[in-house]
Amino acid sequence: MLSNLLNEKTVRIADGKKLDWKTSIKEASKPLLEDGTILNGYVSSMIDVVEKEGPYINIGPVIALAHAQPNGFVNRVGMALLKTKDSIALTSKDHMINIWFVLAAVDSNSHLESIKELTKLLTDPNNVEKLLSANSVCDLLNVIKNVDLNFAVKRKEDKK
């Protein structure tokens, strides 16, 4: 479940006034650094990829999913979320971001279920609006938990 990865330790809110896109990725990564999920080299890898490839991590209006190839800097699958009250330009003003996800993968497959659940969360415009209007970590977690519940119910129905 998404809430196993996105919880009170890995979800944060910042005003964003003093952040640029690199600092936003670093701030979003902090919980994963603090709990040993990733090492600093992974944060550098995520920034390097954006510098080389452009804003490909901009996966939808106001949403970025920072990630890099699985490498020796990831100890286990992890995800973190930073919501900024102010929009931050990801490489240019054409890519304004408020919702910064960080995904850490140890291989090419172990994170796929998490991606599927994240897709369920972010493809519903109502969920995105709720994330944007959230004023607390608790508000953000409630949106995520609600999606988890709906996802679990759907899986049970699909098995019938």
What are the roles of these predicted feature ranges?
Residues 1-160:
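Cytosolic covalent-transfer regions centered on His/Cys nucleophiles
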